[in-house]
A protein has these predicted regions:
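Periplasmic c-type cytochrome electron-transfer domains
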Residues: 2-7, 17-189
């Protein structure tokens, strides 16, 4: 056994030595700038010109991400299928939605999703703000019938009225379905 290990070590040294060549001693490395950018550290926040991130939006988005009132049965939140405790993904083979209905796929992670070129497995949403709105009205997922019903539930809550006003200051009517998506998107960014 010792002889084999010694032989393997000598072969390894011989191969390592074969890769060395005399010269200036400096390695010349050419790196494509696109490749370098692809492997650089991710930014702390994925910036969006259309949805500047603020602390108030993040706070509202966090609250909405865990809000079960966004589902028809008042029992499913974004976190139900994108569990932050499971790295923002679903732990099952397929996602379970309204009244136990099974989705066609499992939910992709929301971690770093704002850096993706498109959302959903099929790319049908351009950004996390648009993606956040889809499952709420999907009859298999959260099953709300329409955006006005979703917003009616939130308008009935004084705390949400104040949080939307703080997150979208200066807007005449900050409590909109689009702003719901912007807030969740800010939290995911």
């Amino acid at each position: 056994m010792r002889v084999r290990m010694l032989a393997a070590g000598l072969v390894g040294l011989a191969l390592a030595g074969a890769g060395c060549k005399k010269g200036s001693g400096e390695a010349v490395v050419q790196v494509d700038t696109l490749q370098l950018a692809a492997f650089s550290p991710l930014p702390e926040v994925m910036v969006s010109q259309a949805n500047p991130v603020t602390d108030a939006k993040i706070d509202l988005g966090r609250r909405l991400f865990f809000e079960t009132q966004l589902s028809a049965g008042n029992n499913i939140s974004c976190n139900s299928c994108h569990a932050l405790s499971a790295f923002g993904a679903d732990t099952g083979a397929v996602s379970i939605g309204h009244q136990g209905k099974k989705g066609g796929r499992n939910s992709p992670t929301v971690y770093n999703a704002a850096g993706h070129i498109a959302q959903f497995w099929d790319g049908r949403a351009a950004d996390v703000e648009a993606q956040a709105l889809g499952p709420i009205l999907n009859p298999v997922e959260m099953a709300m019938p329409a955006a006005p019903q979703v917003m009616g539930r939130l308008r009935g809550n004084a705390e949400y009225r104040a949080l939307f006003a703080a997150a979208f200051p200066g807007e005449r009517n900050p409590l909109t379905y689009e702003n719901l998506g912007r807030a969740i998107g800010a939290f995911e960014r």
